[in-house]
From Swiss-Prot:
An example Gene Ontology CC term for this record: cytoplasm
Pathway participation: Amino-acid biosynthesis; L-arginine biosynthesis; L-arginine from L-ornithine and carbamoyl phosphate: step 2/3
Catalytic activity: L-citrulline + L-aspartate + ATP = 2-(N(omega)-L-arginino)succinate + AMP + diphosphate + H(+)
Name by which UniProt lists this protein: Argininosuccinate synthase
PROSITE patterns associated with the record: ARGININOSUCCIN_SYN_1, ARGININOSUCCIN_SYN_2
SUPFAM superfamilies tied to this protein: Adenine nucleotide alpha hydrolases-like, Argininosuccinate synthetase, C-terminal domain
Keywords recorded for this protein, A-Z: Amino-acid biosynthesis, Arginine biosynthesis, ATP-binding, Cytoplasm, Ligase, Nucleotide-binding
Length: 403
């Protein structure tokens, strides 16, 4: 009788390598899937390691382009910052990984999908809800959550079964990285009073070692999509990776955040998001120039809802297409160039321009070139303040009766 197949989200690390053997011992044929969403992973190494530790098949997918265009871009256009700080680095990649796992499960006839999340984090929710939304007939397995071993027990299991142990296993931090940034937790970072050691950072320079001369760059957008740096066009994924390097060397994008996790606990996280934070700031400035007041004031309602939806693992909910449709419509005229100075940990906006600019200098100026009709203000103020005036007249004439 043929074994059931399970598709495992495989990173090449200790947890998922042990999971291959553990799932095999449970009677499954394991199909490993490794994705590159911009962390610089050696896909061929990941593929071969999965086979080495017992997978019957191993798939590797370069998903940077799809990740940037279909997941990161809406988050950028929504200025998605969970609790006004976290640009959803890990949360954004989970629905894409889930999508690829389900696609390969359906292609190979697998009956289950597995992930390497613990029972304490948000990612288990994001993966399982996404997978259920995409194919409710698939079983979802969580071996790391089920076995609940300590790190030492896991290492002993790996040694006993000749599973290669990663050379960076003594790294005290739990790290997740993709092109939108890098997240870091555990170790000394679990103490919210502790200063994050420099060893916790990889994408950004400490302020003491940043250049004493700023980089001044121009970011070009077309309908809300970043398309060029200093006039040089890039595909979106490569533009973000390039900006990570430029802004990162100036120490831009370090975030230290005690956040409210979906599972009900608070967690101290350290993030590095040089490209993300620079792009979000520049995009917002271009919107300030091009969006009419009503749209600009309403859009944050949609932004907050999409941010929560992503963080809470509901990317594939029925609400998401409606939110993205609003975002797409809102970006029709968000075309132009923003000039940014990168210096000593800051991305400073120095200028913005657009053919769709709603800023009229002749109306805004206080010079003799002023074309604003000052006399119109009298009638406007009278009508604008009329409800307030009437209310005041009534309340002053009649005192409220308290029953």
């Amino acid at each position: 009788m043929a074994k059931e197949k399970v598709v495992l989200a495989y990173s090449g690390g200790l947890d998922t390598s042990v999971a291959v053997k553990w799932l095999t011992d449970k009677g499954y044929d394991v199909i490993a899937v490794g994705l590159d969403v911009g962390e610089g992973k050696d896909l061929e190494f990941v593929k071969q390691k999965a086979l080495q530790v017992g997978a019957i098949q191993s798939y590797t997918i370069d998903a940077k382009k799809e990740y940037a265009e279909s997941f990161v871009l809406p988050a950028l256009q929504a200025h998605a910052l969970y609790e006004q700080k976290y640009p959803l680095v890990s949360a954004l990649s989970r629905p894409l990984i889930s999508k690829k796992l389900v696609e390969i499960a359906e292609q190979t006839g697998a009956t289950a999908v597995a992930h390497g999340c613990t029972g304490k984090g948000n990612d288990q929710v994001r993966f399982e809800v996404s997978i259920q939304a995409l194919n409710p007939n698939l079983k979802v397995l969580a071996p790391v959550r089920e076995w609940a071993w300590s790190r030492d027990e896991e290492i002993e299991y790996a040694k006993a079964h000749n599973i290669p142990i990663p050379i960076d296993l003594d790294n005290p931090y739990s790290v997740d990285q993709n092109l939108w940034g890098r997240s870091n937790e555990c170790g000394v970072l679990e103490d919210p009073w502790a200063t994050p050691p420099e060893g916790a950072y990889a994408l950004t320079a400490p302020l003491e070692k940043t250049p004493d001369t700023p980089d001044i760059i121009e970011l070009s957008f077309e309908k809300g999509v970043p398309v060029a740096i200093n006039g040089e066009a890039y595909p979106l994924d490569q533009l973000i990776l390039t900006l990570n390097e430029i802004a990162g060397k100036h120490g831009v994008g370090r975030i230290d955040h005690v956040e409210n996790r979906l599972v009900g606990i608070k967690s101290r996280e350290v993030y590095e998001c040089p490209g993300a934070m620079t792009l979000i700031k520049a995009h917002k400035e271009l919107e300030d120039l091009t969006l009419p007041k009503e749209l600009a004031h309403f859009k944050p309602v949609i932004e907050k809802k999409l941010t929560e939806l992503i963080y809470e693992g509901l990317w594939f909910s029925s609400l998401q297409p409606a939110l993205l449709a609003f975002l797409k419509e809102s970006q029709t005229h968000v075309t132009g160039v923003v000039r940014v100075k990168l210096f000593k940990g800051h991305a400073i906006i120095e200028g913005r321009k657009s053919a769709y600019s709603l800023y009229n200098e002749k109306l805004a100026t206080y010079t003799p070139d002023d074309e604003f009709d000052h006399s119109a203000a009298v009638g406007f103020i009278s009508l604008w303040g009329l409800p307030t005036k009437v209310h005041s007249m009534v309340t002053k004439e009649k005192k409220e009766v308290t029953l």
